[in-house]
Amino acid sequence: NMPSLLYAAKSARAPYMLPAGPEAIDLSHQLLTIPVGTSATITFSATLDDTRYSSGSEPVQNIAAAEFYIDTPPWITATTPLPIAMTPADGNFDSSVEVVNGSLDASGLALGRHSVFIRGQDAAGNWGIVAAFFVDVVETESLYLPLVTHP
């Protein structure tokens, strides 16, 4: 089953720690390709779920925090990754499954591909499985906008 295989691959870095925290799933995002220098805000959301794959053997806690990182994942310690807080869609971190929202000012992003890493933490302090997506910053003339016509 594909979801279990993806979960195993994403948790392989710390297989006895990461599954204790919430998994970031169901990413939704806008503006994945933007011209360099554009003053645009990239908005995105994710669901943080502390109930997945527990089968009753793993305790379930409320989500306590959510954050994202640009270009450097949180487990890289050679540099200091900068966490940026995300907010709960309903205004409160008060359940074991939460939709969280984030926004990123794209005006400072350099030309090229950038990674955005999202993770959540439960009330017991466990950080969970990270999810990620790409944002491409391109030269203005190389921005491809498809033309759709109907016969």
PLM features: what roles do these ranges have?
Residues N1-P3:
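N-terminal pro-sequences and low-complexity stem/linker regions of secreted or lumenal proteins
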Residues L5-L27:
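Proline/serine/threonine-rich low-complexity linkers at boundaries of modular beta-sandwich domains
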Residues P19-E139:
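Long, low-complexity serine/threonine/glycine- and acidic-rich segments characteristic of extracellular
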Residues P146:
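Conserved functional hotspot residues at active sites or interaction interfaces
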Residues H150-P151:
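Short, solvent-exposed mixed-charge patches
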